[in-house]
Design a protein with these regions (language model features):
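Metal-dependent de-N-acetylase/amidase catalytic core
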Residues: 2-6, 82-243
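Active-site rim/loop-helix segments in enzyme catalytic domains that contact anionic ligands
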Residues: 1-95, 234-240
Length: 243
């Protein structure tokens, strides 16, 4: 299956937390979207690899994504190495997305930083014909996506653009809450973590409100790009005429 957008995440729930509204907006518009989780999140304090797998499947159904894979790399060890790099290259070549998303490269979690580096390097090397990868024992052709965008996790950055998710914020939160072992559940007997506190979901909404405010909308999600982006001035003027 050829995808329009492919999102790479260190752990199940990272994509939903960071850009769940954007994912819902894309799939609602008919775009084909996939998520590749690098690890099963087995080092997480709450839940297990098995429960998070089921939760990830449920969240993906809520967001109506077309593909979800888990590379089953070692949680807590997502650092650059050739094996991990080639697995990511293989997924890029398999799904041939126009755009890929990765965690922002400055973050408090080492796995997020490692995932960011791996995806950036994989994007470049996926276009080189002399780097060989296989999928189901078939040699893959080189392919390089058009753009790499970074989504926001712990640390903020000055966005290259903000996506209006006002009509999709509720869907995002429903997908986030599909990870019921990870977030607040008054009936849970597992140890409390930062993200399982009741206030964490309020933090999530506050960030979305903050970036929505910056673009004059109710809710927004922020993204970064290391390259300059083309600005469609004519399209903006034409859309303004319709309002």
């Amino acid at each position: 299956m050829i995808l329009d957008v492919l999102i790479f995440a260190a752990h199940p729930d990272d994509a939903e937390l960071s850009m769940g509204g954007t994912i819902a907006k894309l799939t609602s518009a008919g775009m084909k979207v996939g998520i590749i989780d690098l690890s099963k999140g087995e080092l997480g304090t709450r839940g297990s690899a098995e429960t998070r797998k089921k939760e990830a499947q449920n969240a993906g159904e809520i967001l109506r994504i077309d593909v979800r894979e888990n590379l089953e790399l070692k949680d807590g060890s997502l650092k650059f190495n050739d094996e991990y790099l080639r697995k990511i290259i293989s997924r890029i070549r398999k799904y041939q997305p126009k755009i890929i998303f990765a965690p922002y490269f400055n973050d408090r979690h080492p796995d997020h930083i490692g995932t960011s580096q791996l995806v950036k390097e994989a994007m470049f090397f996926s276009g080189l014909a002399k780097i060989n990868t296989e999928d189901n024992e078939r040699i893959q052709m080189p392919f390089r996506p058009q753009k790499l965008f970074y989504y926001m996790q712990t640390y903020e950055f000055k966005p290259a653009f903000v996506v209006d998710i006002s009509n999709f914020f509720e869907t995002k939160m429903k997908a986030v809450k599909a990870y019921d072992t990870q977030f607040h559940n008054p009936e849970s007997k597992e140890p409390e973590t930062f993200i399982s506190q009741p206030i964490f979901l309020k933090y999530l909404e506050a960030r979305a409100v903050s970036y929505g405010f910056k673009i004059g909308k109710e809710y927004g999600e922020a993204f970064y790009c290391e390259e300059e982006l083309e600005f469609d001035l004519i399209g903006l003027l034409k859309s303004a005429e319709k309002k």
